[in-house]
Regions:
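Charged interaction scaffolds used for protein-protein
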Residues: 1-98
Length: 98
């Protein structure tokens, strides 16, 4: 962290929250009985795509604190969820934050 200002540190923190939510959103089930992955993915989906209420407010606040436009982030999340074949999704998510 060295020379990072407090603002930059917070921005990294909030960016990491979005990054993790995108990773959760694109998780694949490891077995038929693995409900924790489905629950995690469902929670991430609700966080990205709920457009009213506290969940939507939280999403927008996290995006604002990360310095990212919530509409842009939501559109990106939509695109990775609906991408055919999950092969390069993780790479797209990583590139999104570069």
């Amino acid at each position: 962290m060295g020379n990072d200002t407090l603002e930059k540190r917070y921005r990294k923190l909030y960016t990491s929250v979005i990054f993790q939510a995108l990773m959760d959103l694109t998780k694949l089930n490891t077995s038929i009985t693995d409900t924790s992955v489905s629950v995690t993915r469902g929670n991430a989906h609700a966080w990205f795509f709920t457009t009213s209420g506290q969940t939507a407010d939280d999403f927008e606040e996290v995006c604002d604190n990360a310095g990212l436009d919530p509409v842009f982030v939501r559109d990106f999340a939509y695109s990775v969820v609906h991408e055919k074949g999950n092969k390069n999704v993780k790479k797209r998510i990583i590139r999104f934050f570069e």
